[in-house]
Amino acid sequence: MEQTFIMIKPDGVQSGLVGEIIGRFEKKGFSLKGLKLLTVDRAFAEKHYADLSSKPFFNGLVEYIVSGPVVAMVWEGKNVVTTGREIIGATNPAESAPGTIRGDFAIDIGRNVIHGSDAVESARKVIGLWFPEGVANWSSSLHPWIYE
């Protein structure tokens, strides 16, 4: 089964959106496999966003991520990477549809509440970074009611 990495950014945590966001993924039928509330240091944030290090917004992004606690999660389910991105909405909240997390709760691209993996391979890499000890291996009793 496919897994994805989802992170509620400091503005999402400070705004009290953790439960709402978890609920949206659970209601879709995805299984929560890993969860951490933590404040990351600069070196870790730079490693997480290494693919963006040449971008002009990189330093601001890193400062934002280390500014407060984040919630790091691993979700599992059929097409969870693609569907997770649809639940989240466009990177720019102004382009996010109502009903998406960013469409409902974010205004500015620089404070867009949540991060989600964009591909299965990048999810695998980031999950290894954030959860080197691994994640919970369990199956919901609802699986037969959700998946064919």
From Swiss-Prot:
InterPro entries: NDK-like_dom, NDK-like_dom_sf, Nucleoside_diP_kinase, Nucleoside_diP_kinase_AS. Pfam families: NDK. One of its GO terms (biological process) is GTP biosynthetic process. The active site is at H115 (pros-phosphohistidine intermediate). Keywords: ATP-binding, Kinase, Magnesium, Metal-binding, Nucleotide metabolism, Nucleotide-binding, Phosphoprotein, Transferase. GO terms for molecular function: ATP binding; metal ion binding; nucleoside diphosphate kinase activity. It catalyses: a 2'-deoxyribonucleoside 5'-diphosphate + ATP = a 2'-deoxyribonucleoside 5'-triphosphate + ADP; a ribonucleoside 5'-diphosphate + ATP = a ribonucleoside 5'-triphosphate + ADP. Its EC number is 2.7.4.6. Its cofactor is Mg(2+). ATP binds at K9, F57, R85, T91, R102, N112. NCBIfam families: PRK00668.1. Belongs to the NDK family. Major role in the synthesis of nucleoside triphosphates other than ATP. The ATP gamma phosphate is transferred to the NDP beta phosphate via a ping-pong mechanism, using a phosphorylated active-site intermediate. This is Nucleoside diphosphate kinase A. It comes from Flaveria bidentis (Coastal plain yellowtops). The lineage of its organism: Eukaryota, Viridiplantae, Streptophyta, Embryophyta, Tracheophyta.
